[in-house]
Every structure is written in structure tokens, then in C-alpha cells.
Amino acid sequence: MDQRIMEAGHRENHMKVWILDHYATEMYFDKGGRSYWIAKFLKQAGYDPIVVGSNAKHNSDRQLFFDSPDLWQAHTAEEIGVPFVFVKSRPYVGNGKARVLNMVDFYRNTLKAADELAAHFGKPDVIFASSVHPLTLVAGIKLAKRYGIKCICEVRDLWPESIVAYGLLKGDSLVAKALYAGEKWIYRRADKVVMTWPGGYDYIVDRGWEKVIPREKVVHISNGVDLEEYQRNMALHPYAYPEDVAQDKLRLVYAGSIRKVNDLGILLEAAKILQDRNVDGYELLIFGEGDDKPALERRAEEMGLRSVRFMGFVPKVQVPSVLAQSDINILHNSSTSLDKYGQSQNKFFEYLASGKPVLMTYSVGHSVVKEEKCGIEVSRQTPEAIADAIEWLCDQPREVLTEYSENARRCAQQFDFKNLTDKVIALLEELR
């Protein structure tokens, strides 16, 4: 670690870092997540972080955290000693007008509450604004200007590019053009831009913004996993597979949401192809819940699939145990044009931490799976290509899977949030 980073925690005046993250408050209850872990390791390094998020539970039209007439409330995450601030926002469900108004609430009320927060916690020395939506970044830039400090804008989701990529918005529409203009405004006015994809700056070049947003302003800090917590959960919260899960077959595990956007139907189609080929040396176990699960279960039954099982929901703390007992973990979601910029799904890094090979059903630029040889990547996301990959894995000697496993375990170290936070610290010290 850089000497100035090592010394940072020993300064008399601890740097006060405000982490703005609309959805970070659920991390308070989950005791994990990107902003939670960054705050945890900043605190351990001698910094003085607070995390500011919405008090509205994501995608719930009723539930509020610590509902109160007050503009904000603060509760300390005792495990890490970091205050979490819950800013008043209306509840919402879905992705329509109510969610947009919830975002506006968080933006406005964060700006309104800021002076009270500064009086209570002390004026910030730097703002670390983390998006899922851009209004959080705008709030960070405005607060930095108010207090005469620097603002780091962290981009975890490209708005509107991701909406365009999923076909929910036309790229040449007036709304998209306005959002692109706002995005460019954010990148120009931020003091540093953090992107979670290794090809993040390639996106800026593709937009034609490289003349006004220099490469040195943009830093790649990947998503990752808290390995210490991951190992603790694996030990303290073991998962017992049902006795009728085959012991003599390759155990393929998918763990995650089961929604239309995840497009798990393609895995069922791949399983049908394998069944027609009389390939039965594997069992595909699908963990998770979602609104598409009932339809997929019916479809699997209608297709007569013998090698596919829906395992249901497991608590987050048991996911490490589930993954560690697999032979191969399947990373799958709908492929989009954004894949060329690299991968940043939280799930991927949990898969690496399990120390088991990864089967990616799509290809990406800057591929960790390819570069680190910790699994295989399917070049085309089709049922036939996925079936071919599974059949190939079934035919491999155990030594091949063992090598992939060892590489995954080693690779996970570089994505430990303890190490990733060192990169955040380097930015903070650069802006000090």
C-alpha cells in the first residue's frame, strides 16, 4: 500500500467523508454492500465516514425504514461503527412515476438536510456520491460547491445507456438526449469519476466526450466482496442440500433473481437440448425467487426436464455456503451492448469468492474469467452454445475444474473490498 495511504489513518484530523447512496440504507440491515464495505474499511483506516440514503425500502409501496415526520434520522451500524442517515422519501413500487418522485424526494431532502447533518456530524471534507440514478450525483456536486470541497462521483449504472440497451428507451428520444446531456454535465463537474467497469472510459470515448472528460479523471474501482465476512458467513450459516440432490453428477448452481430480465428460459432450453442428446451427467439447481419463477417452473415441467430443479429462496447469509458446495456456478443474465465495457455484477465476485469455476453464458470485454482462467465464457448467448459448454464441462477430468477453482480463489483476493477501498483512499488523498 502507498505510504501516504498507510499514514492517512494516523492523521490528527480525520477526513470526514459523506457517502451519498440512495439505496445504501438496505445495506444497513443486510450488513453488507458496496457503500457499506467502503465505509467499513474507510473507518478502519482512520477516516470518518457517514452514509446517506433514502428511508424508503426499494420497490415497496408501504415499507419505510424508521418512518418519522423528521427530514432525516441517523442510526449507527454498530458492527462497523459508521452512522447511516435515513433521508425522508416517499415509498414506491415499480419503475414508473412513483419511483421517479422517490428519487426527486431523496435529492431535494438530502440538499435540505445537509446543513443539519453538517452541524450534527461536522462539515464534510469530501463528498463521495454513488449512483444508481444520476440525481444522487447531482446532489453530491451541489453539496461540494456549497461547502467548497471536492466531489467524487461513482457511476454504478449508466443512465440512460443501460435503459437504452435494454430497449426501454430510444437513444434518439428527447428524454434520452436530456439524460445524456445531464450525464455529461456530471462527468465534467465531478472532481473524479469512479466507474465499476474496466472499460468505463471506453464508454466515454464512444459517446465522443473524451475532449472534455480526460482519461486521468476517470478511475476504475470494481465491485467486489468482503472476503472476511464471506468466509464468516460460510462458516456460521451452512446450507444443507436436500439428500435427493445427486452426489454423482456435476452440480451447476444459479443463485439470484428469477425475473424476466434475467431470461432464465434460455437455461431451460439448453437443458432440453442436453436431454435430447442424452447428456445427464449434471444437475442444474436454480436458487432464488422472482415474478418469473412460477412460469418457469411450469415450463420446466411441461418440457419434462429431469436435470433442472428450482431450490427456492435462501437467506443472503447462506449464499456463500450454497455456492461453495457447487461444482460450477452459472453467471447468467440477458446479454446487452454494455457487456463490451466489462463486468461488474456483485454476484460474479461472490462466485469467485466461493472458489468454484464460473460458467458465463455470455461474453464481455475485459473478461476476468478469460484473463484469470477461472472458468469458461460462452461466445454466443444461445441455448445451443450454453448446452455445448455444459456438455464440455461434463466431459472434463476433475483436474480441469480443480485448476479453475484454484484460479477463482486466487483471483477473488484482488476484488476483496479491503483492497478495493485502498483505491478509494488513494483518491481521497489525491484530493485532500
Range-by-range predicted roles:
Residues 205, 209, 219, 224-243, ...:
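Acidic anion/phosphate-binding donor-loop and adjacent secondary structure
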Residues 243-271, 285:
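Conserved donor-binding/catalytic core segment of Leloir-type glycosyltransferases
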Residues 262, 317-322, 329-350, 359-370:
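Nucleotide-sugar-dependent
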Residues 399-414:
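A short, well-ordered alpha-helix in the C-terminal region of glycosyltransferases
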Residues 279, 294-321:
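Nucleotide-activated donor-binding/catalytic signature segment of Leloir-type glycosyltransferases, i.e.
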Residues 135-138, 142-147, 173-196:
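Membrane-proximal helix-turn-helix segments that form the acceptor-binding/catalytic region
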Residues 55, 199, 221-224:
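Carbohydrate-associated surface elements
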